[in-house]
Amino acid sequence: MSAAEGPLVVGVDTSTQSTKALVVDAATGRVVASGQAPHTVSSGTGRESDPRQWWDALGEALSQCGEAAREAAAVSVGGQQHGLVTLDARGEPVRPALLWNDVRSAPQARRLIDELGGAKAWAERTGSVPSASFTVTKWAWLTEHEPEAARAVKAVRLPHDYLTERLTGEGTTDRGDVSGTGWWASGTEAYDEEILARVALDPALLPRVVRPGEVAGTVRDGHGLPFSKGTLVAAGTGDNAAAALGLGLRPGVPVMSLGTSGTAYAVSQRRPADPTGTVAGFADARGDWLPLACTLNCTLAVDRVASLLGLDREAVEPGTDVTLLPFLDGERTPNLPHSSGLLHGLRHDTTAGQLLQAAYDGAVHSLLGALDLVLDADADPSAPLLLIGGGARGTAWQQTVRRLSGRPVQIPEARELVALGAAAQAAGLLTGEDAAAVARRWNTAAGPVLDAVERDEATLNRITGVLSDAAPLLERDAASR
């Protein structure tokens, strides 16, 4: 390992499946060491993890970083959003954490929306309309289904809060992650006491919300990790806000993340409040906002179509009027939760490669619809679209996004954007810089830029028309088919 030019910092990404740690040179952004360790998620009706696994995985990831981790002057944790971590008086988990993708609280979400004045009222108060992924609905589920466990709870945390507190001994969170709970009012930037009372959650059980740029605490003795006592600990944040930091996003720059599900977001200086619930009105980690919309069918759905056709995922062919809507898991944007995949326009001369291209087109059409919803009037329509996530490395994804968006497309070379964003936040504690400015200095968004091409309006209009004509069929639930 060559000598670092500046102090070292650690950025952590505790995701659903694993915890990753990067040791980064605060002066240059160079990653000098990295480590990763897995954790498990329950199967069956719920999705749960023991938070102590996250701590153990953090220790293992840091041990893989070697001596570099011991030299770190600051650390920050980014993590999966929405999870409900319940702790007893000793700081031990009362039960496994309910993760973001545990949707058993869907009935509680519907009831809470009705009880507090409907979707519009929720959006105006919290920036979002709560779904079963939100923490507030999970707490409501817990109090109904496991009342003894709920009574034993002495602290409620989010996943990144849990690791931060084990480092510092202090209960803290940040505005980016807490904005996904459903009990933080985005208008006042404070806990909403009426919502908390409605779900019987004592505000005293919640962590202090640390301001952007504020030190959350320092590493305490007895933690068993390679950090020295007194190492600075930043507030940390949720994974999407951390990735935005990792890209050094400026307001109005669009991001499209291609994973199992698709995500579109952009930093905005306007507080979002979408009464339809399609756009989540999250805060970012700096003082602005991070409106975000998701699609359910992205890389996994298109790969499934490729598999059914016996093709490699890159084996697309142009020149077809066929429309394929790959809604294999229902769809969120557009809001068609009961839909299934739909094929229209098949002809004798349609090839397998054209069918695969149609699947890409259908998935990207949904993502661009999501992107249109999150970009505000101040966004620059000519700004390059940042393409991240596993699918961003695929040529077929790149070219489809380019053709249907009509924008330049930039593919950042940096991969671990959540951990990089956390590292930038940690570096900002040392230098006094804004974390996004640190990432821009590190040039984390650098990567090839594909020039804009003429937007394929014919394909977009055709897919929009099929969606409209097929709406009665797509909106039916399975039982009525």
Swiss-Prot record:
Record carries keyword Nucleotide-binding: yes
CDD domains referenced in this protein's UniProt entry, alphabetically: ASKHA_NBD_FGGY_BaXK-like (cd07809)
Annotated substrate binding sites: 81-82
Record's catalysed reaction(s): D-xylulose + ATP = D-xylulose 5-phosphate + ADP + H(+)
Keywords for this protein: ATP-binding, Carbohydrate metabolism, Kinase, Nucleotide-binding, Transferase, Xylose metabolism
EC identifiers of the protein: 2.7.1.17
Sections of the chain in a coiled coil: none
Gene Ontology molecular function, alphabetical: ATP binding; D-xylulokinase activity
Superkingdom: Bacteria
Swiss-Prot/TrEMBL GO biological process terms: D-xylose metabolic process; xylulose catabolic process
Site, Important for activity: residue positions: 13
Active site: 239 (proton acceptor)
Family: Belongs to the FGGY kinase family.
Reported function: Catalyzes the phosphorylation of D-xylulose to D-xylulose 5-phosphate.
Name of this protein: Xylulose kinase
Native source species: Streptomyces coelicolor (strain ATCC BAA-471 / A3(2) / M145)
High-level lineage: Bacteria, Bacillati, Actinomycetota, Actinomycetes, Kitasatosporales
